[in-house]
Amino acid sequence: MREDAACALEEMFAACKEEIGVTLTSVSGYRSYSKQSTIYNNKLKRVGGSREKADEYVARPGASEHQLGLAMDVGQKSTTNLTASFGNTRGGAWVRENCWRFGFILRYQEGWEDITGYQYEPWHVRYVGKENAALIQEANVPLETYLVDIRGQTLLDIVTGKIIED
């Protein structure tokens, strides 16, 4: 993970432990192109070769936020299974309600599948910086909508979170 994102993640994990006594753990962070290819190809096999179906769950190599060093799949220490049920755990609920305080967003929320293109992933957080995370949380919109609407059609670098000057 990038250093700024990794520091924020450590702060988030410490706050969760302090506030509700739950230990969060990193499950999957930075991925190389090769690792993402393996993950994608494995999903492709599990869904019978349908790229359309695989694309709902796993980013194609070269298109994964994990390759940016800004995303982390998180779990609770008691289980590292990446399933929708994580969202119903104390840790999952805490992440959903509090990750923005540390500059993260819950990237693939329930009900946003048609906008994000991915199924609900309560374990997948994406670092966007504290200012952007607070604005996204307040607006209750996915990153795609924020990048277009909240900044008034201004181009925003999704890696740095800074406005791109013309």
Predicted segments with their positions:
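Cell-envelope/glycan interface and biosynthesis
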Residues: M1-D166
